[in-house]
Amino acid sequence: MTPDRSLPIAMFDSGVGGLTVLHECLVSLPAEDFLYLGDSAHFPYGTKSAEDLRERVVANTEMLLGRGAKLLIVACNSAASAGAEAAREIADAHGVEVVTVIDPEAEIAAAISGTGRIGVLATPATVAGGAYRRALEAQGRGLDVTEVSAPDLAPIIQNGFPFDQSVLDTVRFYCEPLRAASVDTLILGCTHYPLVAPMLQRILGRDVRLVTAGHAIAANAQRILESRALESATSGEGAYRFLCTGDVFSFRELGTRFLQMPLGDIEGV
C-alpha cells in the first residue's frame, strides 16, 4: 500500500523543540505540506520512563496517521530512542515510512569526527535508551563516545526565553564533561538544543563540530519521497498546520521563536 502523494508529511514532538526540524524541512522541501503535532500537554518527554514514552509515541502516531500522511517524522530524540519501533509498527499498516532524528545525526558525527571522540548531549530518557551509543557503534569506527544527561536543559530552554545568565551557566555546567573528554564532535541530542548552539560553540571552542538533525532529516525525507514517487505534484509553496495537546496560546508564542516563521492555524486536540 502506497500513500497518496497529496497527503502531508506528519511530524511530532513533545512540544516546540521539533519546530527546529520543521524549519529545515520547510526550507528544504518548500512544495510539501506538513502537519505538526506538539504534545505539549505531556512535556517534557526527557524524564519519562520508556514505557510512558512508548505510550505517547503510539498515541501521537495513531492521531497523525488517522488524519492521513505520506511520511512520519519523529522529531523528538527521547521519543525516537524509546518508541521508534512502536511508531514503525503502526506506520507499516498504513504503508508509511518513519524517519527519526537519531540515525542521521550518528552517521554525520561519525563521518566528520577527526579524532573519533564524540559527545552526545541529551535528555535522561535518550541517554538511558542507549540509541545514540548503538547508532554510533554501528558505524564501525571504534568511536569513543561520551554521553551527558541533561535533565533540566530542555525545560530551561523552553521556559527561559529570552536567555539569561542562568541558562548560560546551565549550558556551561553540562559542557564540563565534554571538555574533559576532549570531544571534537558534539551531537545535540534534543531538538531544543539548537537554540543554545551559539553558547555551546563559544564554551567548547570553534574546533568542536556541532551536529543537529534538521538538515539530515530533511535530506532523508526527500530521498524517501523520491524513491517512492511521493513528492508533491505541485510546484508552489506548501502549507503547514499544527495540532497542540496543551495551551495553544503558549504554543504559538514559543513556537514562533523556534520555527522562525509565523505559525498559522493551530488546532487544540
Residue spans of the language-model regions?
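Non-catalytic structural scaffold of enzyme domains
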Residues: M1-V269
